[in-house]
Amino acid sequence: NRLFALIGLNGRAVLPMVLGLGCVTMATLTTRILHSPRERLITVFLLALAIPCSAQLGVVLGMLGSLSFTAVLIWTLAMVGVLMLAGFLASKLIPGRRIPLVTELPPMRLPIAGNVVKKTAGRLKWYLIEVIPLFLIGTFLMFALDKLGVLPAIIEAGEPLVTGWLGLPKEASAAFVMGFLRRDFGATGLFAMADALNPIQAVVGMITITLFIPCFASLLMMVKERGMKTALAMVVIIVPFAFFVGGLFNLLLHAVW
C-alpha cells in the first residue's frame, strides 16, 4: 500500500497489476474493483504502458537471459523506473485524490473444492465470451491491412525511426507492427533476429517493444472500459514515449556499455 501510494493508488491496485503479468486484457477488466475513476484510469494506463503479459515476458527473459544477467537487470530497472515515473506523473496530472485502503479481513478458511471448480469454470466461460472474440477481430484486421498493403507501408515508414533513433536493423520495424496484434509476436520477431543483434540492440529492442502499445485485444478492452477518446489519448502518449525511452537507452548504453 505504501509503494502504490507513490503513484496515487492504494494496495487494492496490486491485483490488476499482478494479473497484468498474465494477460493485460483480463487485468484491464479487473480495474473495476478499484473505487474511483481516477484510480482505474491510472491503473489502465500503467497496464498498457509498462506491464508485460506472460507470453511477452517469457520471450523477453528468454532472449535477454541468454545474453547476460546485466541485460536482464537493465531491462528490469527500466520497466520499474518507467512504471514508477509514469505513475507518479499521472497521479499529479489527473485530478482527484487518492482513496485510502480500507478493507475487511475475513477469517481464514480452507477452500471448498466444489466452489473453486464452479468459480473457475465461470471465469473461464466469461473469458472465452469476452476476450477471445477480441483476439479474432484483431487477427482479421491485421490480415485485411496486410492484404490491402497498409502494413508494408507502415513498416516502411517506420524504418528510419527504428534504424536511426533506436539503432536497430530495419527489419525490426515489422516486429513493432506485429506487436500490435499480440505483444508476444513483437518480442518473438526480435527474438528471431537474435543472431543479427548485439547486446545493446537486444536490450533496446526489448525495452521499446515492452513499452509499446498493448495488443489489439487490450486496446479494444481499454475502449470498452475507459471510452474511445481516453484509449486513443493513451495510445498517442505511449507510442512516442516508448520510442523516446528506447532511443534514450540506445544513447546511454552506447556511452557506458
Indicate where each model-derived feature is located.
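Transmembrane helical segments that form the transport core of multi-pass membrane transport proteins
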Residues: 3, 120-199
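C-terminal transmembrane helix pair
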Residues: 12-13, 25-72, 188-257
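Generic recognition of stable, solvent-exposed alpha-helical segments in well-folded globular domains
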Residues: 13-16, 25, 29, 76, ...
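Alpha-helical transmembrane segments of multipass membrane proteins
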Residues: 55-56, 82-87, 138, 142, ...
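Structural signal for alpha-helical transmembrane segments and their membrane-water exit/capping regions
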Residues: 91, 107-110, 139-150, 253-254
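A cytosolic-side transmembrane-helix exit/cap motif
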Residues: 92-101, 172-173, 250-257
